[in-house]
From Swiss-Prot:
The name this protein goes by in its record: 4-hydroxy-tetrahydrodipicolinate reductase
Gene Ontology molecular function terms on file: 4-hydroxy-tetrahydrodipicolinate reductase; NAD binding; NADP binding; oxidoreductase activity, acting on CH or CH2 groups, NAD or NADP as acceptor
E.C. code: 1.17.1.8
List of catalytic residues: H157 (proton donor/acceptor), K161 (proton donor)
Function recorded in the entry: Catalyzes the conversion of 4-hydroxy-tetrahydrodipicolinate (HTPA) to tetrahydrodipicolinate.
PROSITE patterns assigned: DAPB
Catalytic reactions on record: (S)-2,3,4,5-tetrahydrodipicolinate + NAD(+) + H2O = (2S,4S)-4-hydroxy-2,3,4,5-tetrahydrodipicolinate + NADH + H(+); (S)-2,3,4,5-tetrahydrodipicolinate + NADP(+) + H2O = (2S,4S)-4-hydroxy-2,3,4,5-tetrahydrodipicolinate + NADPH + H(+)
A Pfam short name: DapB_C
């Protein structure tokens, strides 16, 4: 049985992840962390009844991870929190599932160094949906055949999302750029802005949109649109739990959802 711990346990994603852990036959929740609601039962926020696991203060992360013998820590919090907590978990020998977006390249380098130094396993992905990762694969293939077309990415999310553009949109851009040998990114357009051979990336924020991503390949006489729409955050939580179940059987290293899904 895999011992799982969850950061941000009272939040929207953390509570869904806990709900999905309770449905797993291979994993059990042993620790839940947040900055508030300390001492309350984690099941209260996941709406799954009393689990007997109290919310621990994230300040006690190292102590609780060691005490509970956690095998894996799932983190869908914020970049400023992940950059602190991921190295602590790695130092405890705990594997990591990181779904936090908005992490800078410098922050990611620090996290990856801690993972390598401590010989743990980690999956780092901006999106744990199976469909989105298939979407990336389709976009990669399309880019190879539509390299001369203008390429635009449009993403839309709820009005509470802090980072823009989304990690998923940036990953889509990276996938295209890798397929085409490198592309410049342009974020939105304003004023006199002639189009070059760049990838345009645009963010929309409004209401309760879970997550929409569209990649457009636009030619002079036709347009190809590849679209993914998320209807529920459950897809991210299910994917994270799937990744956590998978990672514990792997060699130490840093993995993506491509590895988890065999894409």
């Amino acid at each position: 049985m895999i011992n799982a711990a969850v950061l941000g346990a009272c939040g929207r994603m953390g509570s869904l992840i806990i709900e999905n852990i309770t449905c797993s036959t291979d994993m059990q929740l042993v620790a839940a962390f947040d900055i508030g609601n300390i001492g309350k039962d984690a099941g209260e926020f996941a709406h799954v009844g009393n689990l007997g696991i109290q919310i621990s203060d994230v300040k006690d992360l190292e102590t609780v991870l060691k005490k509970t013998q956690a095998d894996v820590l799932i983190d869908f919090t914020a970049a400023g929190a992940t950059i602190v907590n991921a190295p602590i978990a790695a130092g405890c020998g705990v594997n990591l599932i990181i779904g936090t977006t908005g992490i800078t390249s410098e922050q990611r380098a620090v996290i990856e160094e801690a993972i390598r130094k401590n010989q743990v396993r980690a999956v780092i992905s901006p999106n744990y949906s199976v469909g989105v990762n298939v979407f990336f694969k389709i976009v990669r293939e399309a880019a190879k055949y539509l390299a001369d077309y203008d390429i635009e990415i449009i993403e839309a999310h709820h009005n509470q999302k802090k980072d823009a553009p989304s990690g998923t949109a940036l990953r889509a851009a990276d996938v295209i750029s890798e397929a085409l040998g490198g592309k410049e990114y342009v974020y939105g357009r304003e004023g006199i802005a002639p189009r070059g051979k760049e990838i345009g990336i645009h963010a929309v924020r409004g209401g309760d949109i879970t997550g929409d991503h569209t990649v457009l390949f636009v030619g002079n006489s036709e347009r190809v649109e590849i679209h993914h729409m998320a209807h529920s955050r459950q897809i991210f939580a299910k994917g994270a739990v799937r990744a956590a179940e998978w990672i514990c059987g792997q060699e130490p290293g840093i993995y993506s959802m491509d590895d988890v899904l065999g894409l």
